[in-house]
Amino acid sequence: MRHAAPVAGDAENVYLNSYLAPFGEWLACDDVTEILVNRPHEIWVERLGCAQMERHDAPQVDSQLLERLAHQIARINHQGVSRESPLLAAILPGGARVQMVLPPATRGDVALAIRKHRLQDMTLESYFEQSALPSVGNTADDRSALAALLQEQDYLGFFRAAVAARKTILISGGTSSGKTTLLNALLKEIPQHERVISIEDTPEIRLSSDNALGLVAVAGDQGEAQVTVDDLMRASLRMRPDRLIVGELRGGE
């Protein structure tokens, strides 16, 4: 179900527009679909038809502005956001969808994702003519190639090919068996232009990608938030990941 865009009062609009001003250039562009912030002072933008996201320096986008923006968006959506409630899923007055994650559910910085509301009315034929489905590749060929590498016992080639083909990889082993070491080695094979989001209880994953965001599950001790891995998985899917890395799987996630 799509929620109705909130209607902000004049005073609320003044504050909201002020905090959104650093993003105004991209909010106004028809070809921009995603506006992302992983940490202060930088903005990532995705445009229609572009294979890679753009990185822009944004010195005015500091921690204070991001926190104020989060509180203002929460206010106009009749929500609250704080260290005890650090996840915010909301809508801007123009219809753009917003997901924000605040500490302690991040590695220290406020994270922001704005997905602009863009709904095209087209026929099924037009959809397949214009869609990116043909670029997905032949999964049967991928499976055959991976099977051949295993048959040849080329395990290095197998893992490199599996990462390149964006296969789902599950690493399992006993305590101190090198699971995290292997995971960090696999992450180095991910192309730098891809967006990586990690979810962990304790930050151990080394995020080498330029466009990377680390989210942290919180157990709720000492008055902090109760944010589960499952909560963060749902939030991360609204933050445009190319790759989603989960440190430990224990239950419903």
Regions found by a protein language model. Give the residues of each.
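N-terminal accessory targeting/assembly segments
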Residues: M1-G94
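Conserved nucleotide-binding/hydrolysis micro-motifs of P-loop NTPases
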Residues: H41-E42, V61, P104-R107, R118-Q120, ...
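Switch/coupling sub-region of P-loop NTPases
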Residues: A148, E152, L156, R160-A161, ...
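Walker A (P-loop) phosphate-binding loop of P-loop NTPases
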Residues: S176
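Structured core elements
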Residues: E34-L36, W44, A89-I91, R97-V101, ...
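P-loop NTP-binding catalytic core
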Residues: E54-Q64, R75-A164
